[in-house]
């Protein structure tokens, strides 16, 4: 039985501790839109998205009003466009027309982001997939709401190093194409290893081919709630610490489950998953870094940071799986630098380096996220960082990703402003030694021995 204390506790979480539903993401399959005629394909894509998603934003606002739960974003993910446009597109420019159509549809239904301008190339690349990848810089430069992702490896297939090399070049080209906006295009481009089919979070969301025609996935956010709960157990042993995180994660996820089921029922679209991720914002008090510091670190980046993050990630999952029948997506703690005030402060005080962030990604849900680096960083160095991150994901059988922003015209120590939820970031140094000869070998890194389970 729910008592009045629990009701007040939830209200306090929302009003004072920044508890919110970060996103309701509607996944839409576009496989039935495929056509050999590009104009027909674009028409079908626009018509399907605007038909299926027409009530998404209104329903989200309705649930917000009725339950008093803030729902920050309403978003859409679609089938990877390299699969949808393969028959009709014969050049990168053809794919850009689809990006413009998706952008128009997103604007029409009122969502702030649409993900799925994507290619899955973990083992090899078709011509269509290569064309889509080559179109990414132009597509992100001429659209407002489109997010792009490329899966370049997996535990079962290994790492496609040809794709890794190409993505190093594409990240740099995207930075150049959007340099008048502080290279903002790179904030909407993610390179994955082991990308999940049901991720509700941008910029890596796409509607996987294993999914149905449409599905509702929800991502929750509650770093402020977890930090506040830990303040009450300061100095207690690890058992108490873990129990506190776990119970708090349960409450946060329960709210996400409620919103997901309500949205599903009102839209007449099946519920997919709740993503258990703790997603920070640039607001003070809504930070994953501050949780780690509340555990006892002087600053994020200090010795013990990776252990603290591993503990947090595991307890969030243990609490979350009790609260929802279906969990998925990325599910863990996000550590984006520009979107987390505590991370920004740690970088500015010299406590948190790119290498330490890489170590942290081995125990949390995503990877090197929203990190600004000098605009003159070589493409092969970016590719090397992508390869390192993919190797962590491949060997550990987990999702890892890279969202680096080489800011054209900026150098180490400069600050770059992205605005809104994307925040701002200090430009961090990158190792100056070259990996070009390694990246230029080409081919594939084979799957690890423990992937051979048949």
UniProtKB/Swiss-Prot annotation:
Gene3D superfamilies, A to Z: 3.20.70.20
S-S pairs: none
SUPFAM superfamilies linked: PFL-like glycyl radical enzymes
Domain of life: Archaea
InterPro entries: UPF0210 (IPR007841)
CDD domains referenced in this protein's UniProt entry, alphabetically: RNR_PFL_like_DUF711
Protein family per UniProt: Belongs to the UPF0210 family.
Protein name: UPF0210 protein Mlab_1030
